[in-house]
Amino acid sequence: MAVKIRLKRMGAKKSPFYRIVVADSRSPRDGRFIEQVGHYNPVAKPEAEVRINEELALKWLADGAKPSDTVRNLFSKAGIMEKFHNAKNAK
């Protein structure tokens, strides 16, 4: 089972927010997911709001889940990708 960490679109028309979820790569974008890792609100003022459960994100990355490009960028800004690579190279 190929597992991805990706964004699930929520919210009203023209006012989206996203949940960062772990899902099977074959399931639809807004369909079934395994676990919610955080959320991302690009419309929030004064700047975009991002909340990520770092512990869960690192656990899923260690288990082999592949992040989408956007999620990888969000994780990089939060410092999660750096922690993951440091832990991976320390072994």
From Swiss-Prot:
PROSITE patterns the record matches: RIBOSOMAL_S16
GO MF term set: structural constituent of ribosome
CC terms in the record's Gene Ontology section: cytoplasm; small ribosomal subunit
Keyword check for Ribosomal protein: yes
Highest taxon above the source species: Bacteria
Key words of the record: Ribonucleoprotein, Ribosomal protein
Signal sequence bounds: none
Gene Ontology biological process terms from the UniProt entry: translation
InterPro entries: Ribosomal_bS16, Ribosomal_bS16_CS, Ribosomal_bS16_dom_sf
Ribonucleoprotein in keyword set: yes
One protein family per Pfam: Ribosomal_S16
Family: Belongs to the bacterial ribosomal protein bS16 family.
Xref: HAMAP family: Ribosomal_bS16 (MF_00385)
Protein name: Small ribosomal subunit protein bS16
Organism: Exiguobacterium sp. (strain ATCC BAA-1283 / AT1b)
